[in-house]
Regions:
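Gly-rich Lys/Arg/Thr-decorated short loops/hinges at beta-loop-alpha junctions or inter-strand turns
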Residues: 1, 225-227, 265
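Alpha-helix capping and helix-coil boundary motifs
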Residues: 1-5, 177, 271
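Short acidic beta-strand-loop surface patches of small beta-rich interaction domains
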Residues: 261-270
Length: 271
């Protein structure tokens, strides 16, 4: 069975490991070793966990980890690295309609219904769980007029040439730093979690203070202009960086997938 296969894999190279480590001059007490698959080791860990629990040192939280939908279990970073390889992946560019201008920018035209943040992602399946956008605080962003459509777009100035080959196709309206856009609000892409734009609704679900709700602009230094638009979409339940940005915001995570990573009834169009 599955457990026997795993056990055989662990024990397959035990003797070779012992010879190699000894030749390296590293001392290991092989005769009194332990294996994490052994019940006595597992029981020791449970004893430690119970002791910590009794002392009130354990709390429940959420953390982003690699996950296998086939096995329906989390993976260690070591397991993930074993199959690592560089591949070409599909990316999508998405526009988010701005509904409220940030306090730092005096431009009510941002709320004209034709002005959009342009974001980029290589994980489009996380877009139904989008709760925010993120800019780099010191990156230069431009608001441009797309002359063909008449719409206005905001993204990193360094990425203009990637989206517009001909400078005659657009007009730069102004330049601002990413930090100036903090707090700008936008229209949710999907209706599934639109209620989280209301801070009171966020507080009711998360049990934490929430002053502004979801679907707004954040800042983080990990955002770059090497790829995409210089604006990243944030789905806090699906990325470690995303989760850290939202931590303390009072906005609850949304996880509309089951153990096999299939959409649940919350995402009604794709269930």
């Amino acid at each position: 069975n599955f457990n026997d296969k795993c056990r055989a894999s662990v024990l397959k190279y035990t003797s070779e490991w012992r010879k190699t480590i000894t030749r390296m001059g590293r001392w290991v007490d092989f005769d009194n070793d332990y294996k994490t698959m052994n019940p006595d080791y597992m029981e020791s860990i449970w004893w430690v966990a119970k002791s910590l629990w009794d002392k009130g040192l354990i709390y429940e939280g959420k953390y982003i980890l690699p996950y296998c939908p086939r096995c329906a279990t989390v993976l260690s970073t070591h397991e993930l690295a074993q199959g690592y390889k560089d591949v070409k992946d599909t990316a999508v560019t998405v526009r988010f309609k701005i509904t409220k201008a940030p306090q730092a920018i005096d431009d009510k035209d941002l709320e004209n219904g034709r002005t959009y943040f342009i974001a980029w992602t290589t994980t489009p399946w996380t877009l139904p769980s989008n709760l925010g956008l993120c800019m780099g605080p010191e990156i230069d962003y431009v608001k441009i007029l797309d002359k063909e459509s008449g719409d206005f777009y905001i993204f990193a100035e360094a990425r203009l040439a990637s989206y517009y080959k001909n400078p005659e196709d657009y007009e730069i309206i102004y330049r601002r730093k990413g930090k100036d856009f903090i707090g700008a609000k936008y229209e949710p892409l999907f209706p599934y979690f639109a209620n989280l734009s209301d801070p009171a609704e966020c507080e009711k679900i998360s049990g934490q203070n929430c002053s502004e709700g979801a679907f707004r602009m954040f800042n983080a230094t990990y955002v770059s202009t090497e790829d995409g638009t210089g604006i990243v979409h944030i789905a806090p339940a699906f990325g470690e960086d995303d989760n850290l940005v939202f931590r303390g915001s009072g906005v609850p995570n949304v996880e509309p997938i089951d153990a096999e990573c299939k959409f649940t009834s919350e995402v009604s169009d794709y269930k």
